[in-house]
Amino acid sequence: VAQVNARVPEREVQRRLELVKAAYREVAEKGFAEVTLDDIARRASVSKGVTLYYFSSKEDLLRRLFAWLVDSIHERMREAVSSTSGPAEKVRALVAITFPSPSKNRAFFRAFVDFCGLAARRDGFREVLERFYRGCREIDREIVRDGVRRGDFRVRDEEAAASTMRAIFDGLMMQWLAESDLETSFSTYRERCELELLRYLVAGSDRRRGSDPATKPGAAAVESGAG
């Protein structure tokens, strides 16, 4: 009996995860407004009643989905940067997991844009979005600090640099989503993201109008790595 009872929470955790993943696929395909609990239940091969047993409402389920995505992203980011040593390599590792493939990026950012819209209107989603960016900036800041300590990066403000890194990631990703040919343009945006991040970090606040990043220390490594 004890063994059976011990397995119940495990089964419930697994069922919740299955429903969350089903919700992600539905939102990525249809958008938040069009997705229903019936759609999610059908995707997970359960009844709507089962879905409501685990989540009180569609909004509750999608907020949990958003939180799950945030946790997953932070985990992948940490794994990526821990597998490399140099600051520039860590930046490249972040770009690689941020731009994995056209299909994965399209699915994720369609869902993410919906969640950002919800965060502007609903506190529960806003809190999750704040946690997302706080965690990303923390990881980015550690990379910046390491790069500055080694003399590879010349930014003066670690907090501002981490925020700017996020702006480059998000800005280029949003522009890519607006392209008519996502497949063909994908590699261009991924390469540009890597190049702009490293150029910014190497030049940092010391960069002046008309200055050439190639003249900065460490720029040769940036250019060779980006190519």
Residue ranges and their predicted role:
Residues 124-130, 134, 148-197, 204-217, ...:
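Hydrophobic/aromatic-rich alpha-helical bundle segments in the mid-to-C-terminal region
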Residues 29-33, 84, 105, 150:
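Short coil/turn segments at alpha/beta junctions that flank glycine-rich nucleotide-binding fingerprints
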Residues 15, 58, 65, 69, ...:
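Hydrophobic/aromatic residues within well-ordered alpha-helical segments
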Residues 3-7, 21, 29, 65-94:
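Amphipathic alpha-helical linker/stalk segments
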Residues 64, 78-108, 159-165, 190, ...:
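Hydrophobic alpha-helical connector segments
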Residues 18, 22-60, 64:
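Helix-turn-helix
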